[in-house]
Swiss-Prot record:
Function: This protein is located at the 30S-50S ribosomal subunit interface and may play a role in the structure and function of the aminoacyl-tRNA binding site.
Keyword match rRNA-binding: no
Example GO molecular function: structural constituent of ribosome
Taxonomic classification: Bacteria, Pseudomonadati, Pseudomonadota, Gammaproteobacteria, Chromatiales
Cellular component terms (Gene Ontology): cytosolic large ribosomal subunit
Pfam families: Ribosomal_L19
Organism encoding this protein: Nitrosococcus oceani (strain ATCC 19707 / BCRC 17464 / JCM 30415 / NCIMB 11848 / C-107)
This protein's encoding gene: rplS
InterPro entries per record: Ribosomal_bL19 (IPR001857), Ribosomal_bL19_CS (IPR018257), Ribosomal_bL19_sf (IPR038657), Translation_prot_SH3-like_sf (IPR008991)
Protein's UniProt name: Large ribosomal subunit protein bL19
Record keywords: Ribonucleoprotein, Ribosomal protein
SUPFAM superfamilies: Translation proteins SH3-like domain
Gene3D superfamilies: 2.30.30.790
Similarity comment text for this entry: Belongs to the bacterial ribosomal protein bL19 family.
Domain of life, source organism: Bacteria
Alphabetical list of PROSITE patterns matching this protein: RIBOSOMAL_L19
Length: 115
């Protein structure tokens, strides 16, 4: 009984307007950031290295190189602070989790584009 109530409440919270993306894709994520009284959008662009599908608890990890340092950020897929996700390019990979990219540098970390 209580399980059905939880599912009903969670289904109301799910976002419906999310694009289809996979690990290996380059995405630009717009996040609402609150600084004091102001609120602005912050863009984070990088490669999706992991995706976790758990209904309302779904998340994905995006990795980018900023000033020579690798930066990874985990986003909750259905979070209200997540404004939009824009898929810039599709990557052709054969793994679900691309954690091996953490050790790769330069051209070795490139991902082929899906045609």
């Amino acid at each position: 009984m209580s399980n059905n109530i939880i599912k009903a409440i969670e289904s109301e919270q799910l976002k419906q307007d999310l694009p289809e993306f996979c690990p290996g894709d380059t995405v630009q994520v717009q996040v609402r950031v609150k600084e004091g009284t102001r609120e602005r959008l912050q863009a984070f662009e990088g490669v999706v290295i992991a995706k976790r599908n758990r209904g309302l608890n779904s998340s994905f990890t995006v990795r980018k190189i900023s000033h020579g340092e690798g930066v990874e950020r985990v986003f909750q897929t259905h979070s209200p602070t997540l404004e939009s996700i824009l898929v810039k390019r599709r990557g052709d990979v054969r793994r679900a989790k691309l954690y091996y990219l953490r050790e790769r540098r330069g051209k070795a970390a490139r991902i082929k584009e899906k045609i």
